[in-house]
A protein has these predicted regions:
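Phosphate-binding loop of NTP-binding sites
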Residues: 83-218, 224-233, 430-431, 453-460
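Active-site beta-alpha connecting loops in nucleotide-dependent enzymes
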Residues: 46, 314, 336-410, 417
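Acidic, Mg2+-coordinating active-site environments of NTP-dependent enzymes
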Residues: 7, 67-71, 179-331, 356, ...
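ATP-dependent carboxylate/acyl-activation modules
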Residues: 102, 108, 315-321, 437, ...
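Short acidic-hydrophobic, aromatic-tinged amphipathic segments that line or gate anion-handling sites
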Residues: 75-79, 414-424
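Residue-level signal for inorganic ion chemistry
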Residues: 9, 37, 56, 87, ...
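Short beta-strands and strand-loop turn motifs
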Residues: 67-68, 97-103, 128, 179-185, ...
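N-terminal leader/targeting and accessory segments in enzymes
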Residues: 1-86, 90, 355-356, 381-382, ...
Length: 460
């Protein structure tokens, strides 16, 4: 059976048909269209999807949702974005399984992927999740619209930059379980303070089903604020963390030389031991949230434990690569997709545990507003604690940190400040040695992924 029959598409969108077609997939990017897919011609500030209709059908589209008549099979609607939202709502309405929503300042994508791995194993392949970082007003309804009708578990990441944005997303997702991974100064440029971020993240609870469960970080300074907000909408709340007050809490952990972490955790019904393939306390915290969610939606905890032992690092979010250097190899840690003060500190802490020579390539942290100088200067402390041997800072907003480090900070050896990723790559290529560990981390707009691509591809 197709993902969407023609009758279902008409019922969901309320559009006028021209031609009859079913859809096996859904996309709004003509480059992602496969045979039998439905193409949404969305209009944005930068471009208009109607300009790519021919390309979409050349790539195999079965039909399109359009707001202007075209010479291909289509359904004509007044607003294609509203039609996408309507199809997302229809997908959620027909889904008979359990749905989890994931948000937070840090760790959304990693937690979403770990939870998907756990529930996909638990359901023998009947789990669905939002791909990439499709967590905004377009990505969330698209991810819902792609959900197969027989899905047992749906996992959806929801992000926001401003207050009020999550309210609309969670109304679409209507989760049975909502996770807030943590609250930290990400996107603080758009908020008065962290409390404002906490309030905005807490909007995710407003969409909970009547039997909904809120999962919140017990160790976070904004726990009480989140807990108060959650109790207005959730039937029950579950806290996770390292604190003895946590409902799901860490009892013990041991790091292995291979980078794995052996964990003993207390859940509501049992004590559980499992291996986590990713290093770091932030990943331990994420894994506790995952277990809390698996338990909340009735998943298999044993399967979840096995899945977390097999997690691979995500591109731009912790993936590790052995790269070729003269006379041998070096380890590259790819954190090039995102950066904020909390994730920078956590990642540098893990870098500090690595044996051998350490290099950190750090790009500007964006969307920090007036607090940007303060937060960039504060990176001196985790850099010093990690005893990084060579630090390459990238971007104008890193200048203030470069000046501080050059003035002398104990534990920081050598630094370079570069204007661009290209310049940083040239410096890095001159410095790389056998057995080095290189961390590349910065906001996505800094383009540090180009450094990773060059090193992994063996280019210089």
């Amino acid at each position: 059976m197709p993902l969407w029959t023609h009758a279902e598409l008409l019922a969901a969108t309320g559009g006028a048909p021209s031609g009859v077609f079913d859809a096996d997939g859904v996309a709004f990017d003509s480059r992602e269209i496969g045979k039998g897919d439905l193409f949404f011609a969305l209009k944005g500030e930068a471009t208009d999807g109607h300009l790519f209709i021919e390309k979409a059908f050349a790539n195999g589209a079965a039909g399109a949702i359009v707001s202007e008549p075209v010479d291909f099979p289509h359904i004509l609607v007044t607003d294609t974005f509203e039609a996408l939202q309507a199809l997302g709502r229809a997908a959620r309405l027909r889904m008979q399984g359990r749905v989890v929503g994931v948000t937070g300042s840090v760790g959304k994508t990693g937690t979403k992927e770990a939870l998907f791995a756990a529930l996909d194993r638990s359901s023998r392949g009947k789990a669905h999740r939002s791909v990439k970082s499709y967590n905004n007003h377009v990505g969330v309804p698209l991810s819902l619209a792609r959900m197969p009708r027989d899905t047992e578990y749906g996992i959806f990441e929801m992000g926001m930059n401003h207050a009020g944005e999550l309210r609309g997303l969670t109304a679409l997702v209507r989760p049975h379980c909502a996770i807030v991974t943590t609250i930290a100064p990400a996107h603080i440029e758009f908020f008065k303070d962290e409390s404002g971020i906490a309030d905005a993240k807490a909007e995710v609870f407003e969409g909970l089903t009547d039997d909904g469960v809120a999962i919140i970080p017990r160790d976070n300074v904004h726990f009480d604020r989140l807990d108060t907000a959650a109790r207005k909408y959730a039937k029950s709340t579950v806290s996770f963390g390292f604190s003895e007050k946590s409902d799901v809490r860490l009892l013990d952990h041991v790091s292995t030389k291979g980078g794995e972490t052996l964990i003993t955790a207390k859940l509501s019904g049992a004590t559980m031991c499992y291996c986590l393939s990713q290093p770091g306390e932030h990943w331990i915290s994420n894994s506790l949230a995952v277990l809390a969610a698996v338990e909340a939606v009735g998943g298999d905890l044993a399967a979840a434990g096995l899945a977390m032992a097999e997690l691979g690092g995500l591109a731009g979010r912790g993936a590790r690569h052995q790269i070729a250097v003269q006379n041998g190899t070096a380890l590259l840690i790819d954190e090039s997709y995102n950066a904020n003060p909390a994730s920078m500190s956590a990642t540098l802490s893990e870098l500090g545990k690595v044996d051998g020579r350490k290099i950190a390539v750090l790009g500007t942290m964006k969307e920090l507003g007036d607090k940007s100088p303060e937060y960039h200067l504060a990176l001196a402390e985790p850099l010093a604690a990690a005893k990084v041997d060579f630090t390459i800072l990238v971007g104008e907003e890193m200048q203030i940190l470069a000046e501080k480090l050059r003035a002398g900070v104990e534990g920081v050896s050598v630094i370079a400040h570069c204007a661009s990723a290209h310049e940083a790559l040239e410096v890095l290529n001159r410095e790389l040695r056998v057995s080095d560990t290189v961390l590349v981390k910065g906001s996505n707009s800094m383009g540090l992924s180009a450094i990773v691509s060059s090193l992994v591809g063996g280019k210089s």
